[in-house]
């Protein structure tokens, strides 16, 4: 079938059937909840969820950041009154994020300030207490940096982009292509160096399309058949397992059970998920190998004796 399509397209005229362009925006990322901070710190620095919780507790006890075990990523509107003090503190520190704090537009109010979204505690943010930055441990500096950047992002404009979708017909077949051009980086300007290999959107952002109009003729440059095999699912890291625990409903087939798990935010709480992973390691059901979690013989044996309704609910 693939060979036939290549031949038919090669010997047929091709025309642009439609061109659709839309301007869009990407809103500022939200400040951190504990689990979101643990996930990002795991991806960026390789920290375990417990490492993050311990270091974050230390920052909290030093009064440099707000309550560390929060499950919320929004801020109360009255907290906006602290923005000047916080941004001024961040701007004078000798830290990678300080230049961005200095250029922040304090007139911007992002979606993060929303009283209706607040739970028992608000998102984790820097406090008005200026940290003794040089005295912080490396982990504390790195975590404070993540939290500071997420806070500073609230005072930068949304990212603006132009997305293009093109449909063309050739040989009785319809083909599509899409791309995205960034018009203004906005808050994403200081997240440019973050490596997110699994971010499909980032790949699309790098693909731009030439100017085309409906009815334009296009030339067939060539075609080839590529054979491939599906990849095995990647193993969990402590960070991705933490995310899966919070979103466990996505792995559950029973719709009623999945709905219940989604409502209660999955397995464990913000404060206990890290300790659950640690407990599994201490009991030798799983082990950390090259930054990935792998089951031990004991863990595999346990799974073999458990009923399917437990393993695959």
Predicted regions and their residues:
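Core catalytic DNA strand-manipulation module of type IA topoisomerases
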Residues: 1-313
């Amino acid at each position: 079938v693939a060979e036939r399509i290549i031949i038919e397209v090669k010997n047929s005229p091709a025309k642009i059937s439609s061109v659709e362009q839309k301007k869009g925006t990407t809103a500022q990322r939200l400040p951190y909840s504990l689990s979101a901070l643990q996930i990002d710190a795991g991806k960026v620095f390789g920290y375990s969820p417990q490492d993050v919780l311990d270091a974050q507790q230390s920052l909290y006890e030093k009064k440099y950041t707000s309550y560390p075990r929060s499950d919320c990523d929004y801020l109360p509107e009255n907290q906006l009154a602290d923005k000047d003090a916080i941004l001024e503190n961040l701007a004078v520190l000798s830290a990678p994020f300080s230049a961005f704090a200095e250029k922040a537009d304090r007139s911007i109010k992002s979606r993060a300030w929303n009283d209706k979204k607040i739970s028992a505690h608000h998102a984790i943010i820097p406090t008005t207490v200026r940290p003794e930055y040089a005295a912080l441990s490396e982990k504390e500096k790195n975590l404070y940096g993540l939290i500071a950047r997420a806070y500073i992002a609230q005072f930068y404009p949304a990212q603006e982009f132009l997305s293009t979708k093109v449909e063309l017909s050739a040989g009785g077949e319809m083909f599509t292509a899409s791309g995205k051009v960034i018009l203004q980086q906005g808050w994403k300007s200081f997240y440019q160096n973050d490596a997110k290999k699994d971010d499909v959107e980032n790949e699309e952002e790098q693909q731009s399309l030439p100017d085309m109009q409906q009815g334009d003729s296009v030339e067939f440059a060539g075609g080839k058949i590529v054979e491939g095999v599906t990849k095995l699912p990647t193993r969990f890291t402590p960070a991705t397992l933490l995310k899966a625990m919070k979103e466990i409903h996505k792995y559950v087939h029973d719709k009623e059970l999945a709905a219940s798990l989604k409502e209660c935010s999955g397995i464990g709480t913000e404060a206990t998920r890290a300790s659950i992973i640690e407990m599994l390691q201490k009991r030798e059901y799983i082990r950390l190998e090259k930054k990935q979690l792998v089951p031990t013989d004991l863990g595999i044996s346990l799974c073999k004796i458990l009923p399917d309704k437990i393993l695959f609910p």
